């Protein structure tokens, strides 16, 4: 276990360099996650014979990726970043991948901000192409969780979003302090477990949009649990009743998904 506990001391976050451009493992994992999500989406379209053609699907994923990046970055700046006012007054710096002339990529993304960007992109896409948004949302609920696993592995390899201090034998040292590998907990619970739940729900699905609501609820619960092992965000800490910002946002997400589910299930709204 000693090698595992000191893995950060023996691991370089930079995978390789091309013409002086440093390629980080996080970036590689992000690309893998994106491609896997698209491949899984195409697989599920065929498997469940969904009314989505491949051209529309490819176009949709481009729209969604743009929405996710914009939402994730803006969400992080508005919710988590200690320099929010700086970015508001210097908006051109929001997506600046350079720090002091060195390429470091775009750092600081919010999952919950990404969700908002994703939903907006989906609604705009479906309005433009006159498509049913619930079909696309349910497809995303199936195809994203396993891809999400690689995103959290990317966080782990990038040595960020680390866990709270612990004494468990599988903990890893971060700056000389033993901590939970919470990124891997999240990869398992928020990725693999959530996928299993959504996939099984597909075979008992009773209305369009049910899968995305099941995903939202399952992810929120998984994230809420994982936050107990993850170090609270720097500069924010515990926000309310000993809960982190991630837990508060996950609680709001869960309640919202539950209310929408109840309204649709009991025919209080039509879709």
From Swiss-Prot:
Keywords: Cell inner membrane, Cell membrane, Membrane, Transferase, Transmembrane, Transmembrane helix
Family statement: Belongs to the Lgt family.
Protein's membrane topology: Multi-pass membrane protein
PROSITE patterns per the UniProt record, alphabetical: LGT
Organism domain of life: Bacteria
EC number of this enzyme: 2.5.1.145
GO biological process per UniProt: lipoprotein biosynthetic process
Subcellular localization(s) per the UniProt record: Cell inner membrane
MF-aspect GO terms: phosphatidylglycerol-prolipoprotein diacylglyceryl transferase activity
Originating species: Campylobacter jejuni (strain RM1221)
Pathway: Protein modification; lipoprotein biosynthesis (diacylglyceryl transfer)
Keyword Secreted appears in the UniProt entry: no
Name of the protein this chain belongs to: Phosphatidylglycerol--prolipoprotein diacylglyceryl transferase
Keyword GTP-binding appears in the UniProt entry: no
Residues at which a 1,2-diacyl-sn-glycero-3-phospho-(1'-sn-glycerol) binds: 152
Role played: Catalyzes the transfer of the diacylglyceryl group from phosphatidylglycerol to the sulfhydryl group of the N-terminal cysteine of a prolipoprotein, the first step in the formation of mature lipoproteins.
Any one GO cellular component localisation term in the record: plasma membrane
Transmembrane segments: 25-45, 60-80, 103-123, 131-151, 181-201, 209-229, 235-255
């Amino acid at each position: 276990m000693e090698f595992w506990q000191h893995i950060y001391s023996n691991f370089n976050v930079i995978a390789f360099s091309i013409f002086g451009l440093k390629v980080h493992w996080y970036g590689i994992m992000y690309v893998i996650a994106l491609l896997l999500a698209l491949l899984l989406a195409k697989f599920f379209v065929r498997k469940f014979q969904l009314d989505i053609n491949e051209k529309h699907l490819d176009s949709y994923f481009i729209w969604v990726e743009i929405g996710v990046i914009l939402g994730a970055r803006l969400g992080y700046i508005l919710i988590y970043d200690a320099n929010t006012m700086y970015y508001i007054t210097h908006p051109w710096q929001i997506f600046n991948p350079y720090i002091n002339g060195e390429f470091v990529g775009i750092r600081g993304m919010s999952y919950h901000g990404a969700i908002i960007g994703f939903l907006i992109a989906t609604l705009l896409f479906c309005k433009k192409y006159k498509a049913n948004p619930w079909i696309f949302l349910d497809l995303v609920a199936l195809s994203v969780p396993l891809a999400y696993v690689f995103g959290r592995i990317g966080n782990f390899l990038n040595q960020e979003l680390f866990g709270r201090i612990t004494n468990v034998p599988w903990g890893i040292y971060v700056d000389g302090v033993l901590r939970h590998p919470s990124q891997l907990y999240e990869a398992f619970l928020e990725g693999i477990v959530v996928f299993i739940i959504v996939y099984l729900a597909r075979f008992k699905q009773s209305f369009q949009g049910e899968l995305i609501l099941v995903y939202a609820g399952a992810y929120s619960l998984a994230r809420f649990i994982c936050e107990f092992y993850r170090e609270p965000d720097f500069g924010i800490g515990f926000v309310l009743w000993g809960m982190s910002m991630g837990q508060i946002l996950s609680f709001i997400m869960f309640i919202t998904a539950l209310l929408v589910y109840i309204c649709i299930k009991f025919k209080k709204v039509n879709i």
